[in-house]
């Protein structure tokens, strides 16, 4: 799983009946293998209110298909910076909240079995934290896109950087030296939704 893009046209309200549709999307070229999309849609009374594109990578020889245009996103030097301290047990706490008990997020020993130096925080934890911080600053119709670059090993000190744009915000999370990107993306207002 290396990217997510969510378009919310309006919130889903408590008590609403909704339908969910999922399907496979496009192939995407990647230098480490073949990437592909999984598309999900939420509708209320037949009207789409939310859509998600999740992009997954099958490692192997270089893939075929289109290339992600937003991989080249670069923030300005004067962007806003905020330090985050991620503690040892954060992966386990996220598992309790999300129901995702993947061993690579729980403990250093279980992560090593799957080839990681130590356990890592779930990329969706970072995406969720960023969305929670920024979504209050845009209308209810928005697009939130995030690209997961490198794992964040726990415990860690990272820097969340963001900047206002004409359309919304660009953001990233980098290591404490600000040289190694962990994730990056944008939040933009959807017009005429």
Features from the language model and the residues they span:
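A broad, low-specificity signal for short, low-complexity segments enriched in glycine/proline
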Residues: 1-4, 14, 89-91, 120-124
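Mixed-charge, polar/low-complexity N-terminal
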Residues: 4-5, 22-24, 30, 66-67, ...
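Broad hydrophobic/π-residue packing in well-ordered secondary structure
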Residues: 8, 40, 57-59, 94-99, ...
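Small-side-chain structural scaffolding
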Residues: 33, 91, 95-98, 111, ...
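Catalytic strand-loop segment that frames the active site of acyl-thioester-processing enzymes
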Residues: 56-121, 135
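Catalytic-pocket segment enriched in acidic/His residues
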Residues: 109-159, 163-165, 173-176
